[in-house]
From Swiss-Prot:
Pfam family, one: DUF758
InterPro entries for this protein: TNFAIP8-like, TNFAIP8_sf
Family label: Belongs to the TNFAIP8 family. TNFAIP8L2 subfamily.
One example of a Gene Ontology biological process annotation: regulation of apoptotic process
UniProt protein name: Tumor necrosis factor, alpha-induced protein 8-like protein 2 B
Purpose of the protein: Acts as a negative regulator of innate and adaptive immunity by maintaining immune homeostasis. Negative regulator of Toll-like receptor and T-cell receptor function. Prevents hyperresponsiveness of the immune system and maintains immune homeostasis. Inhibits jun/ap1 and NF-kappa-B activation. Promotes Fas-induced apoptosis.
Source organism (scientific name): Danio rerio
Domain text: The central region was initially thought to constitute a DED (death effector) domain. However, 3D-structure data reveal a previously uncharacterized fold that is different from the predicted fold of a DED (death effector) domain. It consists of a large, hydrophobic central cavity that is poised for cofactor binding.
Signal peptide: none
Keywords on record: Immunity, Innate immunity
CC annotations in GO: cytoplasm
Length: 186
């Protein structure tokens, strides 16, 4: 007997539509102003680092799509108890990453590219495990693309170079992360 669920079909349709329409302007209602500012700075970092506008747009677009899809899954209660625990651990890892990024920024000569890269890699692995049965391999590829890009030790080294061109972007990213931590969003 075939099992059909209109709820599942609606969720699939919503994810499909969101994957086609997940642009910054459409996602404004899902992503707050502070997060949007951080995304803008991440775009600028990627654009300056790669020298490739379309690659920078793709990385940030992939990030937005993943955030929106996970938001849809969460709002539709698609995660079981084990996955919800994993989601909490992922959130803790993100908080740890944000606090580490801020600490490295605020305290001179403390930056360690291996620590930052490892946190991002562990976060990627946790997220892939969380969405393993919920998202397509294409979405898994997006997750890998985003995390592998920002976990690149050379990018991180340039980002934390106190006299480098990416420093102003790091200032704004860390200010935004501080806001998200203070208001409990992250």
């Amino acid at each position: 007997m075939e099992t059909f669920s209109s709820k599942d079909m609606a969720l699939k349709a919503q994810k499909k539509i969101l994957s086609k329409m997940a642009t910054k302007s459409m996602v404004q209602m899902i992503i707050d102003d502070t997060s949007s500012e951080i995304l803008d700075e991440l775009y600028r970092v990627s654009k300056e680092y790669t020298g490739n506008r379309s690659e920078a747009q793709k990385v940030v677009k992939d990030l937005i799509k993943v955030v929106v899809k996970i938001g849809v899954l969460f709002r539709h209660n698609r995660f079981n108890e084990e996955e919800l625990k994993l989601a909490q651990n992922f959130q803790k890892k993100l908080r740890q990453g944000a606090m580490t990024a801020i600490s490295f920024h605020e305290v001179d000569f403390t930056f360690d590219k291996t620590v930052m890269s490892d946190i991002l890699t562990e976060s990627r692995d946790m997220l892939l495990k969380l969405v393993n049965t919920h998202l397509t391999t294409k979405s898994h590829g997006r997750i890998n693309h985003v995390f592998n890009h920002y976990a690149d030790p050379e990018l991180l080294t340039q980002l934390y170079n106190s006299s480098g061109p990416l420093k102003p972007h790091l200032n704004k990213i860390c200010n935004g992360l501080n806001k998200l931590l203070e208001n409990g969003t992250l």
